[in-house]
Design a protein with these regions (language model features):
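Short, low-complexity, polybasic intrinsically disordered segments
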Residues: 162-191
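Beta-rich nucleic-acid/ligand-interaction surfaces
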Residues: 44-50, 157-165
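Structural motif
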Residues: 77-80, 103, 151-153
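Conserved small/polar residues in nucleotide/adenosyl-binding loops
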Residues: 193-195
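Histidine-centered catalytic/metal-coordination loop motif
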Residues: 92-137
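Active-site loop/lid in soluble adenylation, ligation, and acyl-transfer enzymes
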Residues: 2-98, 183-185
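Well-ordered alpha/beta subsegment
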Residues: 123-159
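Beta-strand elements of well-folded, non-transmembrane domains
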Residues: 89, 108, 158-160
Length: 195
């Protein structure tokens, strides 16, 4: 699996699909299963394929997604809000799923981005091992910098399986994070808008 550089600008050591499958075979043995039984013969291959999908964000550059913008919007300069963007991620501590929604708003500075691009940025950062706090900040910072926006606001509301299926087991617990930049942070009336 080919990976992009991490935040420390270091490229992780590459691991082949075969090495990943071998690791999953060991995990099956570790939990007490027989990886040679009929129902599990293809499991290491399937899990390797699933992990490629779960963590495809390591192969994407969200800033590149935002490289094409549009200026012909007839002077539109007010807030653009995209709500209920699906978030499917995994916590970096237990690799347990994080399922939720993101609401993203930005105030353009003469140029706007295609609406699907906002959702793609959310997905690009979501498809990595994450903390919700970092995910919220990464989305906001990337939009602010790439679009030269006047302001960005990001809210994520999600359920963490590491809290619902293990440990404290609080099935109804959700986590909400907010991050404001530019005019959203500076203008109290804008920061009170619950996107």
């Amino acid at each position: 699996m080919k990976l992009v550089k991490n935040e420390n600008n270091k490229k992780p050591e590459s691991v082949s699909d075969e090495e990943a499958r071998e690791a999953f075979i060991k995990i099956l043995r570790w939990i007490g299963e027989d990886p040679t039984r009929e129902g599990l013969l293809e499991t290491p291959k399937r899990v390797t394929k699933a992990f490629k999908e779960y963590f495809k964000g390591y192969q994407e550059d969200p800033k590149e997604i935002l490289s094409k913008t549009f200026g012909d919007v007839e002077g539109y300069s007010d807030m653009v809000v995209q709500k209920n963007i699906s978030v499917q991620s995994h916590c970096e501590h237990h690799m347990a799923p994080i399922i939720g929604i993101a609401h993203v708003a930005y105030i353009p500075n003469e140029r706007v981005v295609g609406l699907s691009k906002i959702a793609r940025v959310v997905e690009g950062f979501s498809k990595r091992l994450q903390t919700q706090e970092r995910l919220t900040v990464q989305i906001a910072n990337t939009l602010m910098e790439s679009l030269d926006a006047k302001g960005v606001a990001v809210t994520i509301d999600s359920t963490h399986q590491c809290m619902t299926m293990r440990g404290i087991k609080k099935e109804q617990a959700t986590t909400v994070t907010n991050f404001y930049l530019g005019q959203f942070k500076d203008d109290l009336s804008l920061s009170l808008i619950h996107i």
